[in-house]
Swiss-Prot record:
Official protein name in the record: Serine/arginine-rich splicing factor 6
Top-level taxon: Eukaryota
Organism this protein belongs to: Oryctolagus cuniculus
Entry comment on modification after translation: Extensively phosphorylated on serine residues in the RS domain. Phosphorylated by DYRK1A, probably in the RS domain. Phosphorylation by DYRK1A modulates alternative splice site selection and inhibits the expression of MAPT/Tau exon 10.
Keyword Nucleus: yes
SUBUNIT field: Binds SREK1/SFRS12. Interacts with DYRK1A.
Record's keyword annotation contains Ion transport: no
């Protein structure tokens, strides 16, 4: 009985070690990612306003088209019955 218990404890220990290893890896990845993102965002922020305006106008036109489509759909539904 005592032998099986010691085996189980050693297994759980190895599992916890592998978990801590994967955690440290994910932590290092997150740090490197956040660093690269910060550098990129700083360089991009200078050229952002122009692209922002264009994307905003595009999204507005898209939403208008979708609104018109939904209106035409509702009209066709009301006409059919």
């Amino acid at each position: 009985r005592s032998r099986s218990r010691s085996r189980r404890s050693s297994r759980s220990r190895s599992r916890s070690i592998s978990k801590s290893r994967s955690r440290s890896r994910s932590r290092s990845k997150g740090r490197s990612r956040s660093r690269s993102k910060g550098r990129k965002s700083r360089s991009k922020s200078k050229s952002k306003p122009k692209s922002d305006r264009g994307s905003r106008s595009r999204s507005r036109s898209r939403s208008k088209d979708e609104y018109e489509k939904s209106r035409s759909r509702s009209r066709s539904r009301s006409r059919s019955p």
